[in-house]
Regions:
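Catalytic cores of enzymes
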Residues: 1-322
Length: 322
């Protein structure tokens, strides 16, 4: 758990039922807020056609500088204390950030020579209570996947149906709120190719946009499922409300509360082209089967090798859960 206050920053490391406190002297509360605000503006503008070339380049520099700061202020001291063994695959690490740190990609922190994904397979958890639920006995779940396309994501859906011809597809006018809520309990996995709205202040305004309205965080939390995985390939489905200091109430967490054991979500807006490329890379790993966290780790590694100097193209995807 990462704790940040006016008194300073600390990491609480829980390993083998032992708790270790690691001071984070370079983690300053005021600087963290300033960097978070700048980072959110940069990720919104780095690929925006309305921004000038100079503005997009400046946004790209801000993204890269934020990842370096995250490495130096948070990730490096945490990983130095943990000293994870070199292994293939790398060991798992669950990040439990608080405050403004919930909006930042801890899983992608790096200084150009060293980076978190080189050392561990990262997952996020909104609370320690949610983390405690991982690893509990599971019942068999239906393997048939559900694809919800309410964004005319033709390339993405074409890639998905080629990889998963058995999938149920709710597309266009058929992707209604009632149809989606009725279908979710009958499918072990769900892929949402939807637009999303995320309000940085008001949790209740966070929603996936469907054909006839919206699927809200409360809708997801009130309709329990027993399922393996939800993939939220929409804009900023993982970013929480900035006014919540102890818990990330967002669409991805709502899916966890609804019963999805793993959730893959985006922390900032991605384009439809990015989503299609991501789907083509992710799902072959999931077909093996590979645990979702490791499948995302492999997918991110491929994207990182393709776009080494453009972390906004490989770092938005985060895993929550088991």
């Amino acid at each position: 758990m990462l704790n940040l206050s006016q008194l300073g920053g600390h990491a609480l490391l829980l390993r083998d039922h032992r708790l270790t406190v690691v001071p984070l002297p370079r983690l300053d509360a005021r600087e963290a807020v300033e960097r978070c605000v700048a980072f959110l503006d940069a990720t919104a503008g780095v690929s925006a056609p309305a921004r000038t070339l100079d503005e997009r380049r400046a946004a790209g520099r801000t993204v890269r500088e934020t990842l370096v700061w995250l490495w130096e202020a948070v990730a490096a001291p945490v990983l130095e204390a943990l000293d994870p063994p070199r292994a293939d695959p790398p060991p798992r690490l669950w990040w439990c950030p608080t405050g403004v740190l919930t909006a930042l990609p801890l899983h992608a922190a790096g200084d150009g020579e060293r980076a978190v994904p080189d050392l561990v397979v990262s997952s996020h958890t909104p609370t320690l209570a949610a983390l405690a639920r991982t690893g509990q006995p599971q019942r068999p779940t239906p393997r048939r996947p559900l694809i919800v396309d309410a964004a005319n994501a033709h390339d993405e859906v074409a890639a998905l149906t080629e990889l998963m011809p058995e999938a149920t597809v709710l597309s266009g006018p058929a992707a209604t709120r009632a149809a989606v809520l009725a279908a979710l309990p009958r499918h072990g996995r769900a892929h949402f190719a939807c637009h999303a709205t995320v309000d940085p202040i008001h949790r209740e305004a966070n929603r996936l946009l469907l054909a006839d309205g919206a699927l809200t965080t409360d809708d997801l939390a009130r309709h329990p499922v027993d399922a393996d995985l939800a993939v939220l390939a929409a804009c900023a489905t993982g970013s929480g409300s900035l006014d919540l200091q102890d818990e990330a109430h967002h669409l991805a967490t709502a899916c966890q509360l609804a019963g999805y054991r793993s959730v893959i979500a985006t922390l900032w807006p991605v384009t439809t082209r990015q989503s299609a490329e991501f789907a083509r890379l992710l799902y072959p790993h999931l077909r093996h089967p590979t645990p979702p966290a490791l499948a995302l780790h492999h997918t991110t590694a491929t994207l990182r090798s393709r776009y080494p100097n453009s972390p906004w193209l490989w770092a938005p995807y985060a895993h929550l859960g088991e």
